[in-house]
Amino acid sequence: MTIIYNSKKIIDKKTLAIAQGISSSINRQDINEVRLSNTLFRLAIQKLNLKAKDIMDKSNPYYQENIKGRDPDIDSAYYMIMNNPKLLKSPIALFRNKVVFCSTPSDVLKIC
């Protein structure tokens, strides 16, 4: 299982803890520590069938000042989130052919 998350957010840490309870092998992609591959990011967004801005935290000041009213493509969203990790609204879990956008920590259970 792969978890794309922000280790500085409590909800993301809780999601990771639940994921560790259901899988012994977690590929942690902490966007504060590693530069997530553009390919993995693109795959996750496409499998979620969401627009790139749908995974962004619209209450974030950076979003309000720089993105609001625009519709960034996947590549633009990738670079914005990599440079501003707090923009990622919620963790994303990937396992086999499934991808789940974890709005709540327990959403990660949907991946099983």
Model-derived regions, located:
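Local sequence-structure signature of Cys/Sec-based thiol-disulfide redox active-site neighborhoods
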Residues: 1-21, 26-31
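Thiol/selenol-based redox catalytic cores and closely related redox-interacting motifs
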Residues: 31-111
